[in-house]
Amino acid sequence: MEATRMGFGGLSVPLSLTPNLSLIPQRLLDKHNLSLKPVKIHHLVCVRSTKSSDDLETSRPSTYFSPSLWGDHFLSVSLDHAEFVELEREIETMKPLVKDMLMSSQSSDKEKIRLIHLLVSLGSSYHFDKEIQDILKHSFTKLDGIIVEEDDLETISIMFEVFRLYGHKMSCDAFDRFRGGDGRFKESLAKDVRGMLQLFEVAHLGTLSEDIMDEALRFTRNHLESLTSGNVSSASPHILKHIQNSLYIPRYCNIEVLVAREYISYYEQEEGYNEILLKFAKLNFNFCQCHYIQEIKTLTKWWKDLDLASKLPYIRDRSVESHLGGLGPYFEPQYSLGRIIVAKTIMIIVVADDTYDAHATIPEATVLTEYFQRLNIGADDKLSGYLRIVLESVFEVMGEIEQEMSPKGRSYSVKQVLERFKIIAKAYKQLTEWARKGHVPTFDEYMKVGLVTAGMGDYAGYCFIGMEDINEKEAFEWLNSNPLLIDALNVLFRIANDVGTYETEINRGEVANGLNCYMKQYGVTKEEASRELRKMYIYNKKVVVEEFMNSHDRVPRQVLLRCLNFARLFDVIYTEGDGYSEPKGKIEHFMTSLYVHPIPLS
């Protein structure tokens, strides 16, 4: 089970060039020195075909995915426009009350930061983003004085989280006061359940050089697990449930809106909760949910009109799951159009991906790739059959998005996304060749291609299209500068995806899987390979946090926050296997809580 449950919850380059592997795999592989281990083959899956080379060239896999969980369900869900209006009216009525709390001159810096943390937890902070940034900018200049005599673990941990989330790198030295003479965290801290939980959460915001955060994570996890597994506990039931949820998916391994949905339920059971803040959070969530339902209705109708699920029965029919792919980066109502664009783009790219993975022969994959390089089918071309359907669908959908965004002056982003797709198509073709021939490349060879198909630079580009609050050309200039943040995200996605899909990919003959390739190159078992990939995952999670922190002086926070949220989404999707392809179970539960059940206001 370790291989399929690891707790996960680039900039595309021509294949003729070597992607930036300074982070992984080479540096990590050198560090772990696995190549010096005696080579011993354990359970390596390698297809030995008796077919001729010509047969392999034209072989077609017989892969079909499970049908959609949702079908046309959301088309029958009624949305009352009057409810939309009333929710928005109530939110606007309450905003000044919450703002007054935030800006109160009677509140200390620590009290304001704790309130900011509560607003973030409840999913309401975006309403006051400018005010929050101003407060934190001012408070950070006098941080030493604020914390000099603070000995409350929860308070220090909250301040650490809030400052880091908003781009202020509060030093982890602040936690030295909670360590004993032996350098370890004091065992007496275990009695402070709230402080321990908060330290556990912020330990996920450590960077590469901050070993104390690794120690904090081990220390808090051990004690919190003991607390929840014991028969007797002094903690309240709602706190124990909150701890169990956090141990399963920590806050920064979960998407913002799911954190808010769970935290609202928890906060309502807290003694002395603030009624105004709770009601504001509930109204806000239900208002967001109305937006999500309307967006999914739009996507469902659009997808149904395309009729690709029946024309191309081998593809994944995942409109609601694709919306989750847009919701992860940004959940706020103002990004409604952005979520629709991201979801449409994901769905149409999945059509291409599934064609390469699950249906095309090698010659067909070659033809497909050639047309993607041209970004045009051409009137004189005699392309027929399903390949024409795939190509026309991709080009037409991206053309529709460009046409929609052009009046807003944002067609540049769409052109950039298409240019980047030329490169990812070449990588898809390489994976197709390996799969059809049953070839298991070395891990190093595989990652040169796999980091391209991870496509995090492309994913960021999808998000930029609908972000009207950023300068799209500047955002793509940063994206095209080979940022380390995107490199690390590519590694995270590739590892999470390959581990989460290992069993299903191997069962359908796709032996060029990162886990399988690692087993081959280093002669280790699946369990050993899983552990090493997990180390790479943790390492690159820290890189993401570090680059998020270090880039605020030159990259807009709205851009960086999307990237941080990508990593959180991977942890959700791949918590138990591949939640996108097989959403039945945990992902279905998450989607139901977000899209089906509103929060009762009383």
Swiss-Prot record:
Keyword line: Cytoplasm, Lyase, Magnesium, Manganese, Metal-binding
Pfam (any one): Terpene_synth_C
Cellular component terms per the entry's GO annotation: cytoplasm
Cofactor comment: Binds 3 Mg(2+) or Mn(2+) ions per subunit.
Keyword Lyase: yes
Residues reported in the UniProt entry to bind Mg(2+) 2: 353, 357
GO biological processes: diterpenoid biosynthetic process
Required cofactor(s): Mg(2+); Mn(2+)
GO terms assigned for molecular function: magnesium ion binding; terpene synthase activity
Motif range (DDXXD motif): 353-357
Annotated compartments: Cytoplasm
The family this protein is said to belong to: Belongs to the terpene synthase family. Tpsa subfamily.
PANTHER family assigned: ALPHA-HUMULENE_(-)-(E)-BETA-CARYOPHYLLENE SYNTHASE, OS04G0344100 PROTEIN-RELATED
Domain writeup: The Asp-Asp-Xaa-Xaa-Asp/Glu (DDXXD/E) motif is important for the catalytic activity, presumably through binding to Mg(2+).
Protein's recorded name: Terpenoid synthase 19
Species the sequence originates in: Arabidopsis thaliana (Mouse-ear cress)
